[in-house]
A protein has these predicted regions:
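C-terminal domain-boundary segment and adjacent tail
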Residues: 196-197, 210-211, 326-368
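Alpha-helical scaffold elements lining the catalytic groove of polysaccharide deacetylases
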Residues: 219, 235-262, 271-314, 327-333
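Residue-level preference for the first positions of well-ordered beta-strands
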Residues: 175, 315-317
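Extracellular adhesion/carbohydrate-binding repeat motifs centered on closely spaced tryptophans
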Residues: 1-171
Length: 368
């Protein structure tokens, strides 16, 4: 009938049996020869042929794992339901089953169908569940390569290994330092100071300079700094026409992509010049500023320091240029002093993440 299996011992005696009840659930019994009774098995896993069965506290089979197929089924009202994008306990460990219903074989972070973020080993076993609300992520064939998670007042940024690469206290004060027109020979000096104080900044680069300073851009990206788009040749975009605008943006995006494997998600128009045509054509948020240091004009480190430190407020976007030695010199004071004042130095995108976000075509001077 296909509704009963028996296990026979060495002497031909039946030592266990598994049979399907009237409600469609398998039940497992073992014969106790001491008391000469069949004992229903409860809260136990049993391997039968190429499957593992779990019998709950009532003795009903509620889970079946197919060993060779690496698939798991929940049993409800006698029906087998394939587990997809979810975690299930198999014996003593928890395992993750992907979108195809198979136990995964690639280590990494996964997002379950119910929105839980987990990290699993190469055998599919769950190492840990990562707390918080997943707000944004990138993935490759179901494995997350990065993600942003809100956990209480904290914003965490995870890498592909499930490790926190950045954490920001959303309840704390923060500002975004931005540097335009580079990279240059002075950009590395600024990165040195940022690294020393565990801080980041946003570098709005010119596409025509990217290949010459590829190592600097890679280093900035690896530090967690943001690479923004500042057009290819510092072209004033207002009045340039859609095709010219898009060429300036796309060529820069391609240059950056070639170096770090990802494109900028924000841009700054040269001189801040923009109109509706520019906003529509660039296809990214436009980032202006709330503090203009005019470092390009003064070429004076003290003036640049004062422009920042005497006017800074929570949520500011600060404009500087990494083309000048005086700006690098000023940064050696500005960065530690802002940290001492209690500011978190974040990228533009991080600032936006913590203060309501930004959209393509939107224009932003600060995030309060």
């Amino acid at each position: 009938s296909g509704k009963k299996l028996i296990q026979v011992g060495k002497k031909g005696y039946v030592i266990s049996r598994m049979e399907k009840g009237t409600k469609g659930y398998w039940k497992y019994f073992q014969y106790d020869y001491k008391v000469r009774k069949w004992q229903k098995q409860k809260k136990v896993w049993k391997k039968v042929l190429e499957k593992k069965y779990y019998f709950n506290g009532s003795g009903n089979c509620t889970r079946i794992y197919h060993i060779s197929a690496r698939t798991c089924y929940d049993v409800h009202n006698g029906k087998n339901i394939l587990v997809k994008k979810d975690v299930r306990q198999l014996s003593t460990k928890k395992y993750y089953f992907g979108a195809d219903g198979k136990r995964v074989r690639v280590a990494g972070m996964y997002l379950t169908g119910s929105g839980k973020l987990i990290y699993v080993k190469a055998d599919g076993s769950v190492v840990r569940e990562i707390p918080g609300q997943v707000l944004e992520y990138t993935e490759d064939h179901g494995v997350l390569t990065s993600c942003r998670v809100k956990d209480g007042s904290m914003m965490h940024y995870y890498n592909k290994d499930g490790e926190v690469k950045r954490s920001i206290n959303m309840a704390g004060a923060m500002v975004a330092l931005t540097y335009d027109d580079g990279p240059s020979n002075y950009t590395g000096e600024i990165l040195d100071v940022l690294g020393q104080y565990g801080s980041t900044a946003t570098f709005f680069v010119l596409g025509q300079r990217v290949s010459d300073y590829a190592d600097i851009i890679k280093r900035a990206d690896e530090m967690g700094c943001e690479i923004g788009n500042h057009t290819y040749s510092h072209k004033k975009l207002t009045g340039a026409g859609v095709s010219v605008i898009q060429s300036q943006i796309w060529d820069t995006n391609a240059a950056v992509m070639n170096v770090i494997g990802s494109s900028p998600v924000a841009m700054r128009p040269p001189g801040g010049s923009h109109d509706q045509t520019v906003c529509s054509a660039v296809g990214m948020p436009l980032i202006l500023w709330s503090i203009d240091t005019r470092d390009w004009q003064t070429r004076n480190a003290v003036s640049t320091q004062r422009a920042v430190l005497e006017h800074v407020k929570d949520g500011d976007i600060i404009l500087m240029h990494d083309l000048y030695s005086q700006t690098a010199e000023a940064s050696r004071t500005i960065i530690p002093e802002l940290v001492r004042m209690g500011y978190q130095l974040v990228t533009v995108s991080e600032l936006a993440d913590c203060r309501g976000g930004m959209v393509p075509g939107g224009v932003y001077k600060a995030f309060r």
